[in-house]
Each structure stands twice: as C-alpha cells, then as structure tokens.
Amino acid sequence: CLSNVALLASDGKVVYHHAATSKFPGDRPITEKTVFPIWSMSKPITSVAAMILHERGAFKLDDPVSTIIPQLAKLRVKAGGGKTEPLKKQITYRDLLRHSSGIAGYDGSFDQQGTWKEVMELDSLVELIDLLEVKPIEHQPGKKHTYGLSTAVMGRAIEILSGQPFDKFLEREIFKPLGMEYTRFYLTEQDRGRFQPLFVKLKGKFRPGTPAEDELYYAPKSSLFLGGEGLVSTLGDYGRFCQMLVDRGKAPNGKQIILPKTLDLMLSDQLEGIPGYGDARKGYAFGLGFYFLEDTKKEGQNSPNGIFGWGGYHTTHFWIDPKNKLYAVFMARLYPYNGKTQTEFRKAVYEALK
C-alpha cells in the first residue's frame, strides 16, 4: 500500500481519519502535517479567490480579460495545417474559470503550447503571460472545454485587479481566515522535512520519483505563483478549505469568504453543451472551478446528486456533499494519477451512510 492520508468530516466533526505509511525504500512516516503538492487542487482555491473579486465588482464574468492583460488580445488560434487565425472573440473571465479559453497545457499538448519545462523555468506570472503570448491557442474561446493553464492566467488577473501579489491575496483573503498555515507556493526548510516523496508506478511496480519528475521546485524566492498547479498543502489545511465550502462560504471565525449565492453560481453548469467535459464524464457537469454531479444514475455509482470537488495530478482529491454536510479529502503522492482511489473511497463512504 502506498503512503496516504484521508479525512472525512460530517457536521463539522471529523468522523474518519486515516494515515498509512508504506514500507517502500525512500518513503517517510506520514501524518496529517505531511506536506503534499496539491497540483490541480489549487484551482478551486484560485477560483474562489477570483469570485471574491467578482463579488466586489472588480470584473463581470463576460468581460474580456485583455482589458487588463493586453497580450491576450494578440493571441493566435490554431486553424489546421500548421496555420493560425486571429481571435474571433476575446477570452473572458468566464472562459478562464470554466476552461474554455483555448489555452491548453496538459494532456500532451505542451509540445504545442510551450513545454511544461519552459513553464517550470519561469520566475513570475508576468513571464507566463509573455510565454503564452507567442503560442497559438487550441481553439476559439468559448467553443470547447480544454483543460490547461487558464487558472494560472486567472492568477495573474487577480494580481492586477487586487493590486497585490497573488500569494499575498490568497494569504489575506483565504488562508489566514481559515487557519491554513501550511498552504503556500513554496517550501520552507521545515516543510521540506515533511514533504511527501513522489512514487511512480510502472508496469505494476512502484519506484521512487526523481527530482525531474517532481517537476516544480517550490523555491521560496520564486514569484511563479501558479494558481492552477503550484500550491502545497496538508490534509488538515485543505480540510479547512473544504469545511468553508460545506458551510456555504463561511469561515470558523464567522467571516464570509464568499457569499452562498456566489457558491451557487460556481456550482451551476457553465459549459451548457460546450463539448469537451461532460461527454467524457457521464453524469457530471463543470461550473466555475469545480466539477459537480447532476445525474447519479448516469454516473452509475452511489454518490448523491450535488456533490462537487476536484483532484490533483499526484493522486490527491476531495469532494463536498452539501446535502449530507460532509467533505472528504484524500492525499497520496503517486504518478500516474490513480482515479480508482477516489471512486473506491467515495463508494465506501456512501455504503456506510446507508
């Protein structure tokens, strides 16, 4: 069994906590304070941060982002046969949050988008925009759901709209009010001593990951605050974020991080028939930063309608169940991503709730 931690909370109380350490060479004892790279579980945090600014009137969802990031107006679009064409419409904030901007970056498309290695070597979100400016996007904005670097671009938009570095905005608006003291874009010396090592599974066997396979450096002096990929966190910290979502946007100290109506908007179908997401995930729809289940019969499992959540590249995931007022978080450090852990964990939870 690979090292992992899991947490299930109902009505604000932990009802299940699990920590297991493997016997694989190179592993280390795992606890709820073990630090994990959460990769795409950064996206819901960034999406909430964006909607905080939306509530304050900083932007409307269908405003063009190019009004604050002019380089986005100059993007070219792939047109087939090695040719490109200009944008027919501008990328909007809604496009960034629902991944319909055409900005790719995952699923093998980095060769066309400026390789992931190029992204890793950058020092700031300004440099990220400069890199993306010279790369053609996959399709016209709004035409398809293409998972990629849209949320990272949103991080840069948040910097401009808020007038402060993205990491400081997250710290002030989300992390401090929720008590998420170990969640950040870098590793301290103490963090590195608690950083879960990566394991790679090939042909049914596990081996330790290499430094190159870690991919991100988490250097304290870097200003590359990748809002879609770059945060590290712990089981307890991410649980605090989840509890805020269960509590309809309210922090333990009573502060309203986001309004209930904003959360409802984030959990409404934003793709509305746009291809690229629901066609491959039966029963699920995509909102603004989260998946949500709208047809449990199509899913074919025992999860109730209305659950929502997301996962991360190295086999982390979470889900929120508003109806039962519960959340669950699972963290491991395994590549490639193992989706079975999420399915089996969730199935076991709802079997127990019968």
Where are these regions (language model features)?
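Short, conserved catalytic-motif segment at the N-terminal edge
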Residues: 1-38, 58-60, 74-80, 216, ...
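Short, well-ordered beta-strand elements
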Residues: 317-319, 325-334
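Short, surface-exposed loop or secondary-structure junction motifs
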Residues: 75-305
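Generic C-terminus detector
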Residues: 335-354
